[in-house]
Amino acid sequence: MFAAGLAPFYASNFSLWSAAYCSSAGPGGCSFPLDPAAVKKPSFCIADILHAGVGEPGATPEGLAGASAAALTAHLGSAHPHASFQAAARSPLRPTPVVAPSEVPAGFPQRLSPLSAAYHHHHPQQQQQQQQPQQQQPPPPPRAGALQPPASGSRVVPNPHQSGSAPAPSSKDLKFGIDRILSAEFDPKVKEGNTLRDLTSLLTGGRPAGVHLPGLQPSAGQFFASLDPINEASAILSPLSSNPRNSVQHQFQDTFPGPYAVLTKDTMPQTYKRKRSWSRAVFSNLQRKGLEKRFEIQKYVTKPDRKQLAAMLGLTDAQVKVWFQNRRMKWRHSKEAQAQKDKDKEAGEKPSGGAPAPDGEPEERSPSRSEGEAESESSDPESLDMAPSDTERTEGTERSLHQTTVIKASAAGALLAASSGGSGGSGGGGGGGFNFGGLSSGSTTSAGSSGSHSSGGASELLPAPQPSLSSAPKSPEPVPAPLGGL
C-alpha cells in the first residue's frame, strides 16, 4: 500500500489532519496545542474528519481549509527542508500529491516500515514542542515489537552484533570452500568429525553469544535463548556419537568419495551389500552322480546331448553347461597336478638308484684281492722253505717299509721287482721283461714267486713285499697270469 518514497508523506498527513481539525486555534492559527491531553484521539474515519470543526466557534469551511493547508505546509517544510511543497488549495480529503524528494536526507534511513516512519516524524515534533531542558532527557524506551530509531542527523551504521543475522562466514567456514577442499579434511578418517562439527556450527552459529534480541517476538526470542551453544549442542550430538549405526557406516565411507560421502552415508541402509542377480545352484546327489557318469564318458557334450541330460536330471540347459565348464577346469587342474607329482617322483628316484654303484665296486674287487693275498701268503713259505726266524725277519722289514710312506713302499716294491726279475732272467729266462713292465702289487708278487723258483738264494735275502690296499696305486686293467708256471 505504501511506496518507498510516498510513505513519509501519507504518514505525516494522517497525523497532521487529526491534529489540525482537533486544535482550539482560529481559522488562521497554525500552532498546535502543547498539552497532549487536549488533543483528541486521532481517527481516520471520514465522518470524524468531515465533522471535526463543527462545534468550534468561528470555524468556517474556508478558514478550516486554510488552517489545514497552512499547517500542512508548515510541518512538511520543517520536516523536509530539501523539498518544495505546495499548499493544498482544494479539500483536505483530496490533497495535492507531492513528488518525493530526489535526495534522501542523512537522518532518514531508506526503506523503513510505515510504523517506524510515523515514529520518526512524530519524534522531531515532540522535540520542537518541548524546551531545551526537556530535550536533554533520554528518549522513551521503545515499545515491544518496534526497532530503536536512530537520532536525527546521525549516520546509520549497521552493526553486525546487533542484527539478527550472523556475520558472513569466511572461506574456511564454508562447507565446500576452496580452502577446505584443498585441506586434508576430506580424508575418510576425518569425515565423521567434520560432519559433527558442521552440525554444531549450524545449530549454534545463528546467534552470537551474549547478544540480546529485543525486536523478536516472545516465542522466537525464547527459542533462540534456549539454544545454549555448549549444553544443547552436546545434548543433540550425544545420541549421534553413541549411535551404533556409525560403526556400521565406517565400512561404507569409501563407497561415495568426495563431498557426497557426507550426504549419502546417513541415508544409506545398513544392508547396502548388493544382492547377486543369480543364486548358486545346489545339486542333489542323484543329479551329481548322473553328471559325473556322463563326464567320464564324454568331456564335451553337444547341445542336443546337453538338453537331453538336463531333461533327464531335472536341470536347466544353462546349469548343465556351467557344471561341465567347471568340471573340465577341475579336471585340467587335477591332471596338471598329477603330472607334476609324477615328475617330482621320477626326479627323486634317479639320485637314489645311481648312488650305490661306487660302493659296490670295492666290494666286488675285494674278494679277488684277498684271494691274491692268500695265494701269495701260502706260496711264499712253501716255495721258499724258509725258517721261522727268516719269515719273522722279512715280515718285520716289510712292516717298517709300509709304515714309513706310500712312496717309499712303492719304490721298494719296484726295486724288489727289478732285482728278482734280473735273477729270474739269469736262471729260468724270460721273466724279466714282464716284471719291468708291471708296477702293480700283483705283478711284483708273481715276479717274486717266479724268481724264487729259479734262484732260491737271492729271494731268501729279499723277498717280495705283501700287497695291501693302501701300499700302491691300483690299475684298472685285469692282472694277467704269470708266464712262469709252478
From Swiss-Prot:
Bias (Pro residues) occurs at 475-486
Cited Gene3D superfamilies: Homeodomain-like
GO cellular component terms, A-Z: nucleus
What biological processes does GO assign it?
embryonic digestive tract morphogenesis; enteric nervous system development; epithelial cell proliferation; liver development; negative regulation of T-helper 2 cell differentiation; organ growth; positive regulation of epithelial cell proliferation; positive regulation of organ growth
Q: Where is the composition biased (Basic and acidic residues)?
A: 334-349, 363-372, 390-401
Cite the SMART domains for this sequence: HOX
- A UniProt-annotated Pfam family: Homeodomain
Protein name (Swiss-Prot/TrEMBL): H2.0-like homeobox protein
Native source species: Bos taurus
What gene name does this entry carry?
HLX
